[in-house]
Amino acid sequence: MNNSADITVLGAGSYGTALAISLASNGHKTLLWGHDPAHMQTLAEDKCNQAFLPGIAFPECLHIEADLAKALAASNNVLVVVPSHVFGTVLAQAKPLLRQDARIVWATKGLEPETGRLLQDVARDVLGEQYPLAVLSGPTFAKELAMGLPTAISVAGTCPQFTAELVELLHSPKRLRVYANDDFIGLQLGGAVKNVIAIGAGMSDGIGFGANARTALITRGLVELTRLGEALGASTATFMGMAGLGDLVLTCTDNQSRNRRFGLALGKGCDVDTAQVEIGQVVEGYRNTKEVFTLAKRLGVEMPITEQIYQVLYQGKSPVDAAKELLGREKKSETPTQ
């Protein structure tokens, strides 16, 4: 079956729109679908996503498609960019409409709610073994990507040919550098754990602890990510790359991050509900914290920062008390062999 579009993007929030803009700016015919018909009509009329990326015009190659069946029939390349808690639902909705030659890639960052499973497991449960899978991950703020500011990400998948073709589709010498990676698990995990640590970094700054504390938290957060990755069979080298250290530093240090701003509000005394309302968009790290905590407990992986953030978000502990507990932990060597 021939493609009438080079790629279809499912998810018309800020990040899905930004990726669609980037792809279309490369000259690729890109279809953008979202779940809200009224929102899609507005996008088609305005030729921009005023709600999430105001003032950034759509390239000529970007087309709005409100009909999911038509969007999925147009291309065998499907990029899913929806919140992690609806990832499985969207795949289930798409399944009967997918082409036989479809290939699925996602930029969703997170794990399955309640179970803490990787999204690859969710995708296989919903779709079976038929379709090649891939994931995009790395330090990307949607606004900067949509504006064409220099950005770098990584891509990994189950099919080397699909991964290579995604690199070609996404890569742009002027705006986006794309690195191929063979660690499918590591790329998925990095995108979830960094959201949790970013909340902690925000809480630390909201309390007023300063740059020293924030840097220590980022560094030890990377240790927690690496421990969890090793337990799942990921490569430790991945966590020194775009999807690990890169995404962690970006999300923990810049207020474009909703997770960081959420943590800032908590550190300044807001309760969880008020902080979420203050952000005004989905705070992926809120759910990710429970998911990562659940996964770590199941695997027996020690993640003290994640545990304290979980207690703040779900058990009512104050950020100050969480910080005190972390600082008061038993002394130990930084070198894992000792």
Curated annotation (Swiss-Prot):
GO terms for molecular function: glycerol-3-phosphate dehydrogenase [NAD(P)+] activity; NAD binding. Its main location: cytoplasm. It catalyses: sn-glycerol 3-phosphate + NAD(+) = dihydroxyacetone phosphate + NADH + H(+); sn-glycerol 3-phosphate + NADP(+) = dihydroxyacetone phosphate + NADPH + H(+). GO terms for cellular component: cytosol. One of its GO terms (biological process) is glycerol-3-phosphate biosynthetic process. Sn-glycerol 3-phosphate binds at residues 109, 138, 140, 194, 247, 257-259. The keyword Lipid metabolism applies. Its EC number is 1.1.1.94. NADPH binds at residues 14-15, 35, 109, 142, 258, 282, 284. Catalyzes the reduction of the glycolytic intermediate dihydroxyacetone phosphate (DHAP) to sn-glycerol 3-phosphate (G3P), the key precursor for phospholipid synthesis. The gene is gpsA. The keyword Nucleotide-binding applies. Keywords: Cytoplasm, Lipid biosynthesis, Lipid metabolism, NAD, NADP, Nucleotide-binding, Oxidoreductase, Phospholipid biosynthesis, Phospholipid metabolism. Gene3D superfamilies: N-(1-d-carboxylethyl)-l-norvaline Dehydrogenase, domain 2, NAD(P)-binding Rossmann-like Domain. SUPFAM superfamilies: 6-phosphogluconate dehydrogenase C-terminal domain-like, NAD(P)-binding Rossmann-fold domains. Pathway: Membrane lipid metabolism; glycerophospholipid metabolism. It is found in: Cytoplasm. The active site is at 194 (proton acceptor). Belongs to the NAD-dependent glycerol-3-phosphate dehydrogenase family. It comes from the Bacteria. Coiled coil: none annotated. PANTHER family: GLYCEROL-3-PHOSPHATE DEHYDROGENASE, GLYCEROL-3-PHOSPHATE DEHYDROGENASE [NAD(+)] 2, CHLOROPLASTIC. This is Glycerol-3-phosphate dehydrogenase [NAD(P)+].
